[in-house]
A protein has these predicted regions:
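Active-site neighborhood of HAD-like aspartate-dependent phosphohydrolases
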Residues: 4-66
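Short, solvent-exposed loop/turn segments at secondary-structure boundaries
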Residues: 43-44, 77-82, 112-116, 267-270, ...
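Substrate-recognition element of Asp-dependent hydrolases with the DxDx(T/V) motif
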Residues: 51-88, 97-110, 149, 425-426
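Catalytic machinery of carbohydrate-active enzymes
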Residues: 69, 192-548
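Structural recognition of alpha->loop->beta junctions
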Residues: 87-103, 167-187, 250-259, 439-444
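Conserved Lys-Pro-Asp/Glu-containing loop-to-beta segment of HAD-superfamily phosphomonoesterases
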Residues: 113-149, 287-293, 459-467
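Acidic, Mg2+-coordinating phosphoryl-transfer loop and its flanking beta/alpha structural elements
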Residues: 137-174, 483-487
C-alpha cells in the first residue's frame, strides 16, 4: 500500500459535471523538481523552470493538487522517512502547498499495487481529494506515469526529459514541452468545454449532425447531451453506419438516417434529386438551429449549404475553411484533443453545456447493464449462460488497418485461458469465421450472436475488453469496462483512444504507419499490432482486472 499525507478541507467538495477536471496529480522527480536519484537532502531540491508559477495557475483555477511519487529509496535504505518528509517540506516551501502526497515506498520486487505503473497511487490520491481518477489529470515525465494514469482512467500528459525514451513519447496520449505547457493544456481543455456566455434561454428544436460510423457517433454523445440539456427537442441526422449507435444515446428525440456522400467512406455518386429530398426533409424539421459535429478531417460546409437552403437560421460547426455566410458560429480546435472533448467544445461554442449532474464521459441511454452474469436468464439476454467472471476479446474492426491479425488474437485468447481467464469472443454477423478461429483455443464464440445492444450487455458484464480502435472500445468506455487497447497508430491515440475509462495501450506507437490514417495497413505484416505479445495482454488484463 502507499503512504498518504493528506490535508483536510475537501469533504464538502463534490465533482461538478461542468468541469473536465477536479484535480491535477503530479509526479515529483523530473516533473516538479530536478531528478536527483535517491535524494534525502532538502538542500538538493531544485524546482524545474516555471514550476511555482504554473502550479499557482492551477490553484487559482480551483484545482486540487497532489503529488504521486515512487520512492524506492526508502525500501533500499538510501534515506529515512524523516529525510523524505524534510525533502517534501522543502518542495512545498519552494512550490507552495499540495493538498495530498501519495508515496510508494516499495521497489519493483515487492509487487505492490501502488508503485507506478500500477494505478494505486492515482486511485489513492483521487480518494484523498474527494474525487475520482477520471476527473484527474496526471503530469509525469516517463512512461510509468502515463501507464498509471491510463490504467486508472485519468488523463495523462507527458513532459519529456532527457531520460524519457522515444517510445514513451510516441505512446503518450498528450505531450507537452515542459510543466508550464502542460498546465496550459489542462486549462485550455477546461475552458474549451465551457460556454463563453450562457444562453439567454432554452432553445427550441435543435438539429444535431454526426454522420459516420457507430464509434464516431458514440464519441459525439457528450456534445449531443450538452445540446439536449439546453434544448426542448433534439433531432439527430446520422448515416446508416451510425444509426444503431445513435439509438443508444441519451438526449435524442428523433433520428433521421441519410447517407452524406462527402462523409461516407464508400460514397455513392452525388444525386441532385437525393440532395433536394434531403433539403426538403431537413426543412420539415423546422429547426431553430443546427450543430454540425464532424471529425478533424471532415468539412461541415456542404451540409451547412443545404441547411441554409432548408431555412435553418443558425448553424454552428468546426471549420478551418472560410465558411462565408454558411456558419453563424465558426469554431476552431487544435488537433489531438479527445473526440468527446472536441464535440463538447463545439457545443460550448454554440452556447450549450452539460447539465450540472452530468459527467463529460461517454454514456448510453437506458444502458442494459447487468448486475451479474446470471441476473437475467431471458433467452434474448446474451449474457445469460456466460461465466460469472469473463474477459471479452473483440478481434474485428470496421477498418482493417486497426484490427489485430486473427492469428495473434487466437494466441492472445490461448494465453488468457492458460492464465485462468474465461474468454468470450465477440463479432458481427459478417465476422463469424473470424471469431470461430480466434475462439478455437478455448474461448466462447459469440460471433454474430448479438446486436449492438446485446454487445453492450456482454461488454458491461466483462472484467475487461481486449479490442482494437473500433466501436466496441467506445461502448466499453460508456459502460465503464476497462480496455486493453490494441491501438494501431494510424490516428492519434490521445484523440481516438478509449475515453475516461481504465485503459492499457499496447502496440508499436512509433510504427511507420503512424499518422497515415490508412484504412489498409501500408506495411507488410501489420507489425504495429502483429508484434503485440500475448504475455503483454495477459499482464495488461492483470493490471486492469486483478485475479480474485
Amino acid at each position: 500500500m502507499s503512504t498518504s499525507i493528506a490535508r483536510g478541507g475537501w469533504s464538502d467538495l463534490t465533482p461538478s459535471g461542468r468541469a473536465l477536471f477536479d484535480a491535477v496529480l503530479l509526479d515529483r522527480d523530473g516533473t516538479l523538481i530536478e531528478d536527483v536519484p535517491y535524494n534525502g537532502d532538502p538542500e538538493k531540491v531544485r524546482p524545474v523552470p516555471g514550476a511555482r508559477e504554473a502550479l499557482d495557475r492551477l490553484r487559482a483555477a480551483g484545482l486540487r493538487l497532489a503529488v504521486v511519487t515512487n520512492q524506492s529509496g526508502l525500501a533500499r535504505g538510501c534515506f529515512t522517512e524523516r529525510q523524505l518528509r524534510a525533502v517534501h517540506a522543502r518542495v512545498e516551501e519552494l512550490l507552495g502547498p499540495f493538498d495530498d502526497w501519495q508515496v510508494c515506498p516499495h521497489d519493483d520486487a515487492d509487487g505492490c499495487a501502488c508503485r507506478k505503473p500500477a494505478p494505486g497511487l492515482v486511485h489513492a490520491a483521487a480518494r484523498a481529494l474527494g474525487t475520482t481518477p477520471t476527473r484527474c489529470a496526471l503530469v509525469g515525465d516517463i512512461g510509468r506515469d502515463m501507464t498509471a494514469a491510463l490504467a486508472a482512467g485519468a488523463t495523462g500528459i507527458l513532459v519529456p526529459t532527457p531520460v524519457t525514451r522515444p517510445e514513451e513519447v510516441a505512446e503518450a496520449p498528450t505531450v507537452a514541452r515542459d510543466l508550464p505547457a502542460a498546465v496550459d493544456e489542462i486549462l485550455r481543455r477546461m475552458r474549451a468545454v465551457r460556454p463563453v456566455a450562457p444562453r439567454a434561454g432554452r432553445a427550441g428544436t435543435v438539429l444535431v449532425v454526426r454522420s459516420d460510423s457507430a464509434g464516431d457517433v458514440l464519441v459525439t454523445g457528450p456534445g449531443i447531451r450538452a445540446v439536449a440539456a439546453g434544448a426542448d427537442r433534439v433531432v439527430l441526422l446520422c448515416g446508416p453506419r451510425g444509426r444503431v449507435a445513435a439509438e443508444l444515446l441519451p438526449g435524442i428525440d428523433e433520428i433521421i438516417e441519410w447517407p452524406l456522400p462527402w462523409i461516407d467512406s464508400n460514397p455513392e455518386p452525388v444525386d441532385p434529386q437525393d440532395m433536394r429530398r434531403l433539403t426538403t426533409r431537413l426543412a420539415a424539421v423546422a429547426a431553430d438551429e443546427a450543430v454540425i459535429f464532424t471529425s478533424f478531417h471532415q468539412s461541415p460546409l456542404p451540409l451547412a449549404l443545404l441547411l441554409r437552403m432548408a431555412g435553418v437560421p443558425r448553424i454552428s460547426a468546426i471549420s478551418d475553411d472560410y465558411p462565408g455566410s454558411l456558419l453563424d458560429t465558426r469554431h476552431r480546435v487544435p488537433t489531438g484533443i479527445p473526440e468527446p472533448e472536441r464535440a463538447l467544445s463545439l457545443a460550448a461554442a454554440a452556447g450549450y453545456t452539460l447539465a450540472p449532474d452530468d459527467e463529460p464521459g461517454l454514456r448510453l441511454r437506458d444502458s442494459p447493464v447487468p448486475t451479474g452474469a446470471g441476473a437475467d436468464t431471458a433467452p434474448e439476454n446474451p449474457v445469460a449462460g456466460l461465466p460469472d467472471d469473463y474477459v471479452v476479446v473483440h478481434p474485428g474492426s470496421s477498418v482493417p488497418a486497426r484490427a489485430c491479425p486473427a492469428g495473434r488474437c487466437a494466441q492472445i485468447v490461448a494465453a488468457l485461458v492458460a492464465d485462468g481467464r474465461r474468454v468470450v469472443v465477440t463479432g458481427g454477423p459478417d465476422e463469424r469465421d473470424l471469431t470461430a478461429r480466434v475462439a478455437a483455443a478455448g474461448g466462447i464464440d459469440l460471433g454474430g450472436a448479438t446486436d449492438l445492444a446485446g454487445l453492450v450487455r456482454v461488454i458491461a458484464g466483462a472484467r475487461c475488453l481486449v479490442v482494437g480502435n473500433t466501436g466496441p472500445a467506445h461502448l466499453a468506455a460508456a459502460v465503464g469496462t476497462p480496455v486493453v487497447s490494441l491501438f494501431a497508430p494510424t490516428v492519434p491515440f490521445g484523440q481516438w483512444g478509449p475515453y475516461r475509462v481504465p485503459t492499457v495501450r499496447l502496440g508499436d506507437a512509433g510504427a511507420p504507419c503512424r499518422g497515415t490514417r490508412a484504412a489498409v495497413c501500408p506495411v507488410a505484416g501489420h507489425p504495429c499490432l502483429a508484434g503485440v505479445e500475448p504475455a503483454e495482454v495477459v499482464a495488461a488484463v492483470r493490471l486492469l482486472a486483478p485475479p480474485d
